[in-house]
């Protein structure tokens, strides 16, 4: 079974400080969090762990309550994760019958309805740079008028890929390259004989993509 403990995310002390504070006081979570930083630094893994903790009835990612079981089984009704397809823009959706995982679909059929199981609903965009211009404008209005139980998480490599009007309304949670000590820990846990250490950073151009993927999964 996959573990969902935040402390398993290595080398991201600044980000974890933000997230642990919000877990202890979930009512202070802002409408929009932006997780930003290089590939392979655990942004999506951290978002999953953070959300599971907040949605948990005990606030501890207990693994036992109905919320945790639903999350583990990928069936939590209050966790909406937009699919990530390389290069495919997330559309605003048609006026009459917006397709699933379009922005109009989200606004009309999910955003303003109360959560089914937990106290909050989370909407996650694993690559927020794929949100189309028209869709981003529509989302901006929703962020300004978000119901008290809905929270957004945008994940992006570079804040410059988002509109300034979006970024200015968010709390930005930074993720950074890992130092050599943490890389060696991951190296050992994954069973690799070597990892490319360059200046204490995990640099995507010098590290195989499959290694980056494994690091992020951890």
Predicted regions and their residues:
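Short, well-structured alpha-helical patches and their helix-loop capping segments
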Residues: 99, 120, 127, 131-135, ...
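Conserved catalytic/switch belt of AAA+ P-loop NTPases
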Residues: 112, 137-154
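Conserved adenine-binding aromatic site and its adjacent loop/helix in ATP-hydrolyzing domains
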Residues: 109, 141, 168
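Charged, glycine-rich active-site and insertion segments that engage polyanionic ligands
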Residues: 1-53, 70, 148-151, 156-218
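Clamp-loader machinery-focused feature within the broader ASCE/P-loop NTPase space
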Residues: 1-134
């Amino acid at each position: 079974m996959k573990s969902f403990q935040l402390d398993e995310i290595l080398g991201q002390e600044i980000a974890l400080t933000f997230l642990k504070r919000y877990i202890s006081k979930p009512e202070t979570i802002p409408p929009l969090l932006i997780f930003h930083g290089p590939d392979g630094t655990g942004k999506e893994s951290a978002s999953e762990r953070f959300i599971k903790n907040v949605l948990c009835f005990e606030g501890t990612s207990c693994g036992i309550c109905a919320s945790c079981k639903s999350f583990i089984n990928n069936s939590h009704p209050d966790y909406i994760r937009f699919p990530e397809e390389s290069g495919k823009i997330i559309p605003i959706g048609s006026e009459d019958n917006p397709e699933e995982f379009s922005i109009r679909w989200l606004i009309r059929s999910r955003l303003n309805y109360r959560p089914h199981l937990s106290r909050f609903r989370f909407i996650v965009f694993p690559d927020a740079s794929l949100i189309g211009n028209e869709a981003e404008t529509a989302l901006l209005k929703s962020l300004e008028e978000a119901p008290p139980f809905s929270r957004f998480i945008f994940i992006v490599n570079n804040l410059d890929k988002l509109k300034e009007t979006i970024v200015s309304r968010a709390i930005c949670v930074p993720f950074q390259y890992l130092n050599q000590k943490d890389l060696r820990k991951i190296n050992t846990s994954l069973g690799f004989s070597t990892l490319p250490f360059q200046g204490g950073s995990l640099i995507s151009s010098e590290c195989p993509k499959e290694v980056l993927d494994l690091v992020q999964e951890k």
